[in-house]
Amino acid sequence: METKAILRGVRLSAQKGRLVADLVRGKSVDQALNILAFSPKKGAKIIRKVVESAIANAEHNDGADIDALKVKTIYVEEGTTLKRFTARAKGRGNRILKPTCHVFVTVGE
């Protein structure tokens, strides 16, 4: 039995999100939450919420035992990039790119 949780449009680059996702892939959910709680990265807080949501989904929808759950798959994909403009000297302008990503978590026994 596998249960999913998805978070779309997170204001985080996919590259930075993947660094955090690699830390918890394949771990038990208890161990994964512990790693994410003490990680100083911005992506850790975001991914922790998605893992907690997947755990809640497994408990509520499937009646799963929380202690037996593991993070089966976790991956981060690129989302749309927000394009912004900032004024520069001599009437010029530069683009500012604000990347987003989608986080997918699957937990199971």
Swiss-Prot record:
Cellular component per GO, a single term: cytosolic large ribosomal subunit
Gene3D superfamilies: Ribosomal protein L22/L17
Highest taxon of source: Bacteria
Keywords, comma-separated and alphabetical: Ribonucleoprotein, Ribosomal protein, RNA-binding, rRNA-binding
GO molecular function, one term: structural constituent of ribosome
GO biological process, one term: translation
SUPFAM superfamilies per UniProt: Ribosomal protein L22
UniProt xrefs under NCBIfam families: rplV_bact
Family: Belongs to the universal ribosomal protein uL22 family.
PANTHER family per UniProt: CHLOROPLAST 50S RIBOSOMAL PROTEIN L22-RELATED (PTHR13501), LARGE RIBOSOMAL SUBUNIT PROTEIN UL22M (PTHR13501:SF8)
Function: This protein binds specifically to 23S rRNA; its binding is stimulated by other ribosomal proteins, e.g. L4, L17, and L20. It is important during the early stages of 50S assembly. It makes multiple contacts with different domains of the 23S rRNA in the assembled 50S subunit and ribosome.
Protein name according to UniProt: Large ribosomal subunit protein uL22
